[in-house]
Curated annotation (Swiss-Prot):
Protein name from the UniProt record: Movement protein
A single cellular component GO annotation: membrane
Keyword Transport set for record: yes
Short name of any one Pfam family annotated for the protein: TBSV_P22
A GO BP annotation: transport of virus in host, cell to cell
Annotated organism of origin: Cymbidium ringspot virus (CymRSV)
Family: Belongs to the tombusvirus/aureusvirus movement protein p22 family.
One MF annotation (Gene Ontology) recorded for this entry: RNA binding
Main localization, broad class: host cell
Domain of life the protein comes from: Viruses
Keywords, comma-separated and alphabetical: Host membrane, Membrane, RNA-binding, Transport, Viral movement protein
InterPro entries listed in its UniProt record: TBSV_p22 (IPR005332)
């Protein structure tokens, strides 16, 4: 599958002005993940496309990630799309490690995945290996999705959703050594 990566270099203030808040998306950074379906459950009532063999493909998936933290914060992670139609949760695509302090646009022309026209499309997205210095509750970035189905020229989208830290053990560990260093300097004075 071909994927195009485009890092957009813009000043942070300009990026922040572009952010529009939509429905909230919560992604757990720890042991569990909460995912948002790529397609609405009632998509068959809205989509009219020619289907061969009763299966339909998802194509031209475009994902835009807009940071809600400073570029210097060091937030990074891998974005994945996976099939959640069964327990295996096969990954359809996983990016390289992305710097989530910059605006990122991902384009996936074709997913190696088709689904029965009589069921929901069980494709979900999430983040793994997410690293950030922030504690729970901090919103890190906004994600918006657009996609097309089969041969249809019509484009579908989800409103921008903010991803926030729910659990970040690494961030808490990183804070402890800095407190020790501060206490050492205080005792030496």
């Amino acid at each position: 599958m071909d994927t195009e990566y485009q890092q957009v270099n813009k000043p942070w203030n300009e990026l922040y002005k572009e952010v529009t808040l939509g429905n909230k998306l919560t992604v757990n950074v720890g042991m569990e993940e909460e995912e948002v379906l790529l397609l609405p459950s009632n998509f068959l009532t809205k989509v009219r496309v020619s289907m061969s063999g009763g299966y339909i493909t998802v194509r031209r998936v475009r994902i835009r990630i807009i940071p809600l933290v400073s570029r210097k914060a060091g937030v990074s992670g891998k974005l994945y799309l996976r099939d959640i139609s069964d327990t295996t949760g096969q990954k359809l695509h996983c990016t390289e490690l992305l710097d989530l302090g910059k605006e990122i646009r991902l384009t996936m022309p074709h997913l190696d995945f088709s689904v029965s026209a009589k069921s929901d499309v069980p494709i979900a997205f999430g983040f793994e290996e997410l690293v950030s210095p922030f504690r729970e509750g901090r919103e890190l970035f906004s994600v918006s999705l657009r996609w097309q189905l089969g041969l249809s020229a019509q484009c579908y989208s989800l409103p921008p959703a903010n991803v926030k830290v729910m659990y970040q053990e690494d961030a808490l560990k990183a804070l402890k050594p800095s407190k020790k260093k501060a206490s050492r300097t205080d005792s030496s004075v």
